[in-house]
Amino acid sequence: MANLKVMDQNGKDSGEVTLNDKVFGIEPNDNVVFEAIIRQRAGKRQGTSKVKNRSAVRGGGKKPWRQKGTGRARQGSIRAPQWRGGGTVFGPTPRSYAYTMPRKQRRLAIKSVLSQKLIDNDLIVLDKLTMSAPKTKELVSMLNSLNADGKVLIVSDDNNVQLSARNLAKVKVVPVNGLNVEDAVNYGKLILTQDAVKKIEEVLA
């Protein structure tokens, strides 16, 4: 079990939290993290591209000329693929690029990222994170007091915190159940509350 310092929103010490080694203390598996990111990005692809094959192109129902006797090559339709304006062969059609990944692998991926954050000292735990009103300036001040520079991922269910971060290019706020591998990898610092740590450990431990 690893102990990590807990801070308040002003950057002052507020005690310690014991992190579960089954979640925050495993050996990071980079291959599984990579596969999880590829799967996540594949699920975001639109897959709406479409071309017309010879049956979908307008026209071409009549045989251009008779089968024999003209000296020209036999043709059955002016919309065959070899014709200008003809249909496309094996072109893209609407499809879903999403695919499944075993639950154990998905959980191993997020646990690997969380463990790596702890190893790199990029994990910050707060006693609580609440805002009375959406104030971007207050959120920036809090991040400065926590020495959270660069790209920061905040895990919080507080709506005011989410609204306060909308205008900050390098800050993203996600709910506890929205924590994902791609965001955790793309953002340097990860800020959790003690409640968020408990919920994450309940699901992943």
Curated annotation (Swiss-Prot):
Protein name from the UniProt record: Large ribosomal subunit protein uL4
This protein's UniProt keywords: Ribonucleoprotein, Ribosomal protein, RNA-binding, rRNA-binding
Organism the protein comes from: Lactobacillus acidophilus (strain ATCC 700396 / NCK56 / N2 / NCFM)
Gene3D superfamilies: 3.40.1370.10
PANTHER family: 50S RIBOSOMAL PROTEIN L4, LARGE RIBOSOMAL SUBUNIT PROTEIN UL4M
UniProt record similarity statement: Belongs to the universal ribosomal protein uL4 family.
GO MF annotation list: rRNA binding; structural constituent of ribosome
Function: One of the primary rRNA binding proteins, this protein initially binds near the 5'-end of the 23S rRNA. It is important during the early stages of 50S assembly. It makes multiple contacts with different domains of the 23S rRNA in the assembled 50S subunit and ribosome.
Residue numbers spanned by region Disordered: 43-97
GO CC annotation, single: ribonucleoprotein complex
Biological processes, Gene Ontology terms: translation
Positions with biased composition (Basic residues): 51-71
